[in-house]
Design a protein with these regions (language model features):
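Bacterial N-terminal signal peptides that target proteins for export
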Residues: 1-8
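Hydrophobic h-region of N-terminal signal peptides that target proteins for export
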Residues: 13-21
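A "functional boundary" signal
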Residues: 21-316
Length: 316
């Protein structure tokens, strides 16, 4: 089942930073470190991102910027999540969690926990993911950490989604959104809105889906969440057959991706396929669909291509 559980939720919680340098950036780390972090984010799904993360960690250690150290360790977690390598991700997450707890930036502890669970879900291990979520819930309430509690609610939504109980999952997502808006006003609610948009899009309630998509785009606080919101909005517009609006959104999304790097590879590939379909480049669209790593997503796209090309025999 298609799902964007490979999201790395980049946090905007500031905490207490002891860096001596100026902090005129969204993450409140030393300004001299922020460009390095931006490069690491851009390349986090490529091996180069690991090297940049090492540089960031070393520089942050030298400057005694503990928050930047924690941020540096989110990059390997993101990389191994993107490559679906749970063994390596578990090792990277263990280091990230240890550093986060030592430096009292527990938001990054729970971010690492969430991504461990997401990787298990991506590999079809929903029962083990549920066990991990229960462990995270116990720790979050022990810490009385609001972001940790929110992460539990959100992650349980992901688990029920992957177990194909979308109604229960959607209730968790709505509860997570409500909790976030009430208790974590500085957090980025984009992905909550995206999840709800996807649910109503798949139910065929396009107008409701578009309403949530617009809220996601408006709420986006990071480059990553902005790209994610545009990708989702494009999907909604395509499903509603609003082709002119889709083309405009596609162009905007492409420009942002060129600027900030590829985020959510499968979603980007799907958009390329939609564009090829609209341009009647069906053979190329099939080739692109063959390159999708998720077999179910690939089959869905081939079905869409056959329908739009009028090849109903193969479509059904």
């Amino acid at each position: 089942m298609r799902r964007h559980t490979n999201i790395l939720i980049l946090l905007l919680l500031t905490g207490l930073c002891i860096s001596a340098g100026a902090q005129n950036n969204p993450y409140k780390i030393d300004d001299s470190l922020y460009p390095i972090f931006q490069r690491a984010i851009k390349w986090r799904t490529q091996p180069q991102g690991l090297l940049i993360a090492d540089t960031l960690y070393a520089e942050a250690t030298q400057k005694k910027d503990k928050k930047a150290q924690c941020l540096a360790l989110t990059i390997p977690v993101s990389f191994y999540l993107s490559t679906n390598n749970y063994e390596k991700l578990e090792q990277a997450a263990a280091r990230a969690k240890e550093e986060a707890r030592k430096n009292n930036y527990l938001q990054y502890y729970y971010s690492a926990c969430t991504n461990e669970i997401n990787c298990l879900l991506n590999n079809g291990h929903s029962l083990r993911a549920l066990q991990k979520a229960e462990e995270m819930k116990i720790q979050a309430f022990k810490d009385q950490h609001e972001y940790g509690i929110f992460s539990c609610i959100f992650t349980l939504g992901n688990i029920y989604y992957m177990r194909q109980n979308r109604e229960v999952a959607t209730e968790y997502y709505k509860n997570a959104l409500e909790y976030m808006l009430k208790n974590l006003p500085d957090q980025d609610p984009t992905y909550m809105y995206i999840n709800l948009s996807e649910y109503y899009r798949d139910k065929g309630e396009g107008e409701v889906a578009l309403e949530y998509a617009e809220k996601a785009a408006k709420a986006a606080k990071t480059n990553e969440s902005r790209v994610a919101s545009l990708l989702n909005k494009c999907e909604v517009l395509y499903s509603m057959k609003r082709i002119n609006d889709f083309n405009a959104c596609y162009d905007e999304c492409t420009q942002v991706i060129e600027q900030y790097g590829v985020i959510r590879k499968t979603a980007v590939q799907r958009l390329h396929i939609y564009k090829l379909i609209l341009n009647k480049n069906y053979d190329q669209a099939h080739t692109e669909a063959d390159s999708l790593r998720n077999l179910l997503s690939a089959n869905q796209m081939h079905h869409e291509i056959y329908l739009k090309s009028g090849n109903y025999e193969k479509a059904y």
